[in-house]
């Protein structure tokens, strides 16, 4: 497999770049953001994923290994092929897409052309636990984002209204950024029990 390509940029098109390496021109599909960093006549290096099909071998290029790994993770979802995975990475960069998946943000996923509500829900279900999220220093810690969705889902499963569950979970996570899923669930249940 071809893991990376380095060489002179011969052509930059709307959806791909041609990079000459050792006398061979490699056509590498890439997102608009990646293509915008490349200039004809300059040297470039892209981390690649090679997708082999019965009738084709296609290279997809990425600025770093993290983005390539996320692309390959997206392909593990039933119904998500290389084009759809690239579309997702064109709309959301890798850190943002990881955050969207970790948060279970179906609305953000449906902004990707070709991903409907059902497809977005399937992606969240299959990938939420597979994608790690880098620390961001936002209002909620990374742990808070990762813990919030499962706690809210558990509370809704126990019969609480979604709004009630979200408010209780947010209150608990605001007070304790480092709460685990189980401790946050216990605290939220305690809070909701007092409210009843």
UniProtKB/Swiss-Prot annotation:
One of its GO terms (biological process) is SOS response. It is found in: Cytoplasm. Residues 146-196 are annotated as: Domain III. Residues 139-148 are annotated as: Flexible linker. It holds the Pfam family RuvA_N. It comes from the Bacteria. Keywords: Cytoplasm, DNA damage, DNA recombination, DNA repair, DNA-binding. GO terms for cellular component: cytoplasm; Holliday junction helicase complex; Holliday junction resolvase complex; plasma membrane. InterPro entries: DNA_helicase_Holl-junc_RuvA_I, Hlx-hairpin-Hlx_DNA-bd_motif, NA-bd_OB-fold, RuvA, RuvA_2-like, RuvA_C, RuvA_C_sf. SMART domains: HhH1. A motif (Acidic pin) lies at residues 54-55. This is Holliday junction branch migration complex subunit RuvA.
């Amino acid at each position: 497999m071809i893991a990376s390509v380095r060489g002179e940029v011969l052509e930059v098109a709307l959806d791909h770049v041609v990079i000459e390496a050792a006398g061979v021109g490699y056509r590498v599909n890439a997102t608009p953001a990646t293509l915008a960093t490349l200039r004809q006549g300059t040297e470039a290096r892209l981390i690649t994923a090679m997708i082999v099909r019965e009738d084709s071998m296609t290279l997809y290029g990425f600025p770093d290994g993290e983005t390539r790994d996320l692309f390959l993770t997206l392909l593990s979802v039933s119904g998500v092929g290389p084009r759809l995975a690239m579309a997702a990475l064109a709309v959301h960069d890798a850190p943002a897409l990881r955050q969207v998946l970790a948060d279970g943000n179906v609305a953000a996923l449906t902004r990707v052309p070709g991903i409907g509500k059902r497809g977005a829900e399937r992606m969240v279900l299959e990938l939420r636990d597979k994608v790690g999220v880098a620390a961001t220093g936002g209002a909620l810690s990374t742990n808070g984002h990762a813990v919030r969705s499962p706690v809210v889902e558990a509370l809704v499963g126990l019969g609480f209204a979604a709004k009630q569950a979200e408010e209780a979970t947010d209150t608990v996570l605001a007070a304790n950024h480092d709460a685990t899923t189980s401790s946050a669930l216990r605290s939220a249940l305690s809070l909701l029990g007092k409210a009843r």
